[in-house]
Amino acid sequence: MGIIFSKFFSMILIRAMGLNLTSHFFNSPQSIFSTVFVFIAAMIILSIQVILFVWRTPMSELIKTEYRLPIKKMKMTPFRTLMGVLGLILLGVGYYLSLTLRETWTNYITYTQDFSAILWIPLLILFCCITATYLFFDCSLPALLYFLSKPKKRLIKGAKLIAYNNVRAYLQRTWKSYALLTIITAIAISLIGGTMGVISLNYQATNRIYPTSFQVSGEQAGALRTLLEKSDVPITAEQAIPYKMTNMTVQTRYLGELQDESVENMMVNLVALSDYQRLRKLVPGAPEIRLSTDKQAVLFDSQYDVTRSFITYRDEVKVGSQHNFKLIQAEQDYFGDSALRYSLPNVLVIQDEAYQQIKGFTYTIAYLQTEKVQTDALTQLLDEELPIEWAHPLTYEFSDDQKNVRFYPETARDSSSDSGQTTAYRLTLANRFTTMRGVRRQAGIILFVSLFVGVIVLITTSSSLIVRQFSNTEREKYNYRLLTKLGYTRNEVRKLVYWQNIWIFMPGTLLAILHAVFAINTFTQIIDSPGYWVAHLFAAVAAVVYLFAYLITVKLCLRIIET
């Protein structure tokens, strides 16, 4: 089985990483010996634990066959009821903070200027959920079962009444381990879901940075076309987008600032609306924008998915010395690799008429889409003939009033001078194939490890509950048989087993999934991405795993009772 599963997981790893390898089935004596050694070591450790247990436990306790319910401990005192209510309150506080994390940060930091809240509020959410989990199984759930078994206006009898009391007795013995299993399951789902969400986020971000097969500076576009023709790689689509670099004054407000806005003077790349529409033909995922007047603009920021939680822009922006625009929306960057542009992340889309009126330094980036999958031979040819390097230096300096910019193309700043000049460079080429291959292989390794660990945790926790129920059923099978002698039918006893196991599996499963879902929602409050649907999918998979564990437990428990 170990060899078969090893083969299975190696195939998953090769597929996830996109490797061009063949996984052969072979017999590994070293793996067999290592597995045998691990089993022997585990048996030795288990034997030592059993010996210590027998040595420390009195003989009278070992040979005792009857089991007495902890009736005194099962009593619901006012204090336990109060602690049960407190557990539900803590659970609600944790869930509420996870839903309103961004607003809580903003309001608290605005009034206190305590930026440590960025750290301790998520830790407070974690503390509330963990504490509430233990209180839930120690006090809240037993209190609920107690009140369900004490009806006032209706009569509860038969299987449900017995099931409620059996579950209360079970929780009294195992509430600590049950709470721990729930927390471990929630953490496993959260980490796996969070990992897969981050992988999806990274993949989508990389796909957004490299929307086409190649991005190349206008100066090297001809050389790239020649190399692609030599390699028999046809170009299916191409767009050359001009950018105009100039200065922009924008008013921003950071999280927690008491003042209205901070004025920032930065460099920006301008793009005409018609050029943006041409780019959208190659990048269909880019949002559609409409500028009704020549005084409206849309800002694209490569860090917007992260900074949107901490920075807000004011509507009015000023480009150059005298051109004012109204910022109608802010979006993520869909213009490809920002390293191919001067002034890096910011791109401002404006009407064509306004674009022509503004002065600045103009340069071009060509976006090429190819049909064939890039081969290693083409990759090596590009590395030799058209290496990726920082080139095209552009030196610029602001005027004394910070309203105008003077440019010095193809000139690097003299490092010995203190003239206030700044030199910017840009990359010559961006290759989608090599970058996406590296991202996929890295994501494949992380995905393989996270899924392997997560599946092991789910199987271990569900198996632990199954084994505990087997032990509990074996100990109480004579009580079940006694019920048949007291007049309960076979269907009523089976209903009791179904109903009791529902209360064993359902609360922990629902609570673990709720913890995981709200934890994932906390992640979305920090970094927004559509990739978190994978995390919710894995939470559904966990629910299915526990459903199968429940069905297996019920069937085997019935077999133990009825044989």
Q: Which functions belong to the PLM regions below?
A:
Residues 37-41, 72-202, 515, 537-556:
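Alpha-helical transmembrane segments, especially those used as permease/efflux helices
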Residues 2-32, 92-108, 114-117, 504, ...:
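Short helix-loop junctions at transmembrane helix boundaries
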Residues 1-83:
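Membrane-anchoring hydrophobic segments
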Residues 156-164, 168, 178, 439-445, ...:
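Alpha-helical membrane-protein architecture signal
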Residues 1-3, 75-84, 495-513:
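Selective transmembrane-helix segments that form parts of the transport pathway or gating/packing helices
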Residues 205-459:
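Basic-flanked hydrophobic alpha-helices used for secretion and membrane insertion
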Residues 455-479:
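A hydrophobic alpha-helix feature that marks transmembrane segments and, especially
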